[in-house]
């Protein structure tokens, strides 16, 4: 079995996602940056004909060295799959353990989960992840804590 963190496995997965149309024209889409040192860029959105009322959305989140996302929740209808593209990401969903995921690793966040830690694990190197969300059409995908 191939190591999921190997460069060949990563290339296969990313190539497969590109072939599926998840990563398209990323450079031409607007970026949403927040003061904490991350930028989120929607790269794809598609209604799912086999799941009426559901939409798949792909977002690339880029973290500057030491950057982080503020605590947040995703819609109660949203399942989140996160795949680390580069660097290392420290993540914690409320009630769970803090974990560090490296390039090629992934995790799942259940609908409505409170994401209390999402940050670059390095203070010197950038990091990025691909978040793929499946949620109800029109759902507010991310709501930051006040």
Roles of regions detected by a PLM:
Residues 112-139:
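Ligand-binding loop in jelly-roll beta-barrel domains
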Residues 54, 68-83:
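A short beta-loop-beta micro-motif enriched in histidine and acidic residues
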């Amino acid at each position: 079995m191939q190591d999921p963190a190997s460069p060949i496995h990563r290339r296969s997965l990313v190539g497969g996602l590109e072939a599926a149309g998840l990563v398209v024209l990323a450079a031409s889409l607007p970026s949403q940056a927040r003061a904490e040192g991350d930028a989120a860029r929607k790269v794809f959105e598609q209604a799912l004909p086999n799941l009426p009322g559901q939409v798949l959305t792909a977002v690339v989140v880029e973290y500057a060295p030491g950057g982080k996302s503020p605590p947040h929740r995703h819609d109660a209808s949203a399942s989140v799959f996160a795949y680390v593209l580069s660097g290392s990401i420290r993540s914690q969903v409320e009630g769970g353990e803090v974990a560090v995921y490296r390039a090629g690793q992934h995790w799942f966040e259940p609908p409505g989960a409170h994401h209390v830690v999402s940050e670059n694990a390095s203070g010197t190197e950038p990091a990025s992840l691909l978040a793929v969300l499946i949620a109800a059409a029109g759902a507010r995908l991310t709501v930051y804590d006040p």
